[in-house]
């Protein structure tokens, strides 16, 4: 197992524990981990679960989608900055 795979595995496991601790299925956690797309995003989700104690699956999924949207906005901003830097040089 590569170091990167190990990080992913550990982050996914933390999410599974957090989600099952509040009474939801491990399958939901696995799907969320895949959708979030990075260990840092997964850790943000785990932090949300521990702080907010969501009561419904909808609350979990809504936060997951918000995190994904923020990451996509950040990626687009970085791409735009890189394109602008290439254009200006």
PLM feature segments, named:
Residues 2-35:
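N-terminal acidic leader/helix
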């Amino acid at each position: 197992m590569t170091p990167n795979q190990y990080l992913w595995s550990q982050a996914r496991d933390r999410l599974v524990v957090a989600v099952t601790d509040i009474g939801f299925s491990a399958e939901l956690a696995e799907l969320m981990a895949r959708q979030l797309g990075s260990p840092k995003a997964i850790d943000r989700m785990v932090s949300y679960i521990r702080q907010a104690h969501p009561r419904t699956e909808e609350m979990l999924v809504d936060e997951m989608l918000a995190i994904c949207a923020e990451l996509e906005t950040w990626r687009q901003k970085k791409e735009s900055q890189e394109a602008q830097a290439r254009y200006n040089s």
